């Protein structure tokens, strides 16, 4: 990823194939724990390879970086088709590397794609995999999308006891 970005270009199809295999940090919490001696090599390698900000974001994402099964994604799109959706502005609000974009059926390919991803590495991979999409790497609450802009929001956002500040909606205590 760093080489591709350093050369200021988009990934080739072969590089996209490699990048698409990235599954996030969700299963690697032990690799971020200095006290886990059997993960010591991985811990030190991550500290060496990632910038301090990348490391912090990757470590924070270990609790919620789990990707959705293709079976579930296909079913969600089948449901959208049955509801009559064929094209429009599509939002993936917690996109990971964009598996929902990648599995979008041909019948919806004329849609305009918008994605948001909090983790820097994951979001940068998504940008390489879907250069035609508008991918923002930040918390969704920090985006400036207008209300009523999206025709469909699809994805599998993290579940948990998270509360974020959003000036527009804080008064409702969402």
Please provide the spans of the model-predicted regions:
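SAM-dependent methyltransferase catalytic-core segment centered on the flexible catalytic loop
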Residues: 94-174
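Class I S-adenosyl-L-methionine
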Residues: 1-129
């Amino acid at each position: 990823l760093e080489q591709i970005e350093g050369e200021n270009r988009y990934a080739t199809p072969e590089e996209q194939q490699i990048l698409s295999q990235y599954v996030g940090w969700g299963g690697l919490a032990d690799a971020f724990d200095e006290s886990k001696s059997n993960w010591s090599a991985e811990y030190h390698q991550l500290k060496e390879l990632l910038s301090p900000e990348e490391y912090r974001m990757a470590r924070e994402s270990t609790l919620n970086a789990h990707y959705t099964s293709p079976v579930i994604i296909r079913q969600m799109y089948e449901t959208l088709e049955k509801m009559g959706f064929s094209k429009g502005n599509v939002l993936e609000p917690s996109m990971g590397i964009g598996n929902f974009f990648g599995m979008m059926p041909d019948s919806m390919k004329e849609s305009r794609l918008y994605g948001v991803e909090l983790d820097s590495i994951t979001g940068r991979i998504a940008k390489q995999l879907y250069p035609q999409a508008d991918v923002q790497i930040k918390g969704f609450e920090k985006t400036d999308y207008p209300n009523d802009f999206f025709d469909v929001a699809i994805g599998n956002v993290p579940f948990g006891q998270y509360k974020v500040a959003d000036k527009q909606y804080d008064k409702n205590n969402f």
